């Protein structure tokens, strides 16, 4: 809310106007929830809320996987080394190139089909869907596999300052 208010004040816009992205988002949520209720009654509303909860949960798990264990110096620009990527063709097709996560952070203005695969960025050991299932159903196995990848990241990608942060954590 604070960030949005600052954005609107900077542009000399009304904080309660329709340019407020949060208000628009809340209104859309109310509208879709209402439509779900009017079309399907309580069952329709319940199914919509269940779908929304599931989608948000999966998004958070994917976000967790994409940044698992990586460190960055506070205030430093996000670089390609600060997120896990995958060159899995199936994951790229099904997830609209979210697999090219470093490119998304480096060039957030690009459309998903314009994102490039970075060969010199940290790579997940498997595709997104495999990593997702592993994280949800076998978190111990996920952590075991990723601990090896993190050791590799420390050697190949971490800056000297990031190595100091890592050392201070243990």
Task: Give short role names for the model-derived ranges.
Residues 1-22, 48, 54-170:
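Cytosolic/stromal cytosol-facing helical appendages immediately following the last transmembrane segment
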Residues 24-36:
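Core segments of transmembrane alpha-helices
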Residues 38-46:
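Transmembrane helix interruption/hinge and helix-loop junction motifs
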Residues 36-39, 51-54:
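Short, conserved, surface-exposed binding loops centered on an aromatic residue
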């Amino acid at each position: 809310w604070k960030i949005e208010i600052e954005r609107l004040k900077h542009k000399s816009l009304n904080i309660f106007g329709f340019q407020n992205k949060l208000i628009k988002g809340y209104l859309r949520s109310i509208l879709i929830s209402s439509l779900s209720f009017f079309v399907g009654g309580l069952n329709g509303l319940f199914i919509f809320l269940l779908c929304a909860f599931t989608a948000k949960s999966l998004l958070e798990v994917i976000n967790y996987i994409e940044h698992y264990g990586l460190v960055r110096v506070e205030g430093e620009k996000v670089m390609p080394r600060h997120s896990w990527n995958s060159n899995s063709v199936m994951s790229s097709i099904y997830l609209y190139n979210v697999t090219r996560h470093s490119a998304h952070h480096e060039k957030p203005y690009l459309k998903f089909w314009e994102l490039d695969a970075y060969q010199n960025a940290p790579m997940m050991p498997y595709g997104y869907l495999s990593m997702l299932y592993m994280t949800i159903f076998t978190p111990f196995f996920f952590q075991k596999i990723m601990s090896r990848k993190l050791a590799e990241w420390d050697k190949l990608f971490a800056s000297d300052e990031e190595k100091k942060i890592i050392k201070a954590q243990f």
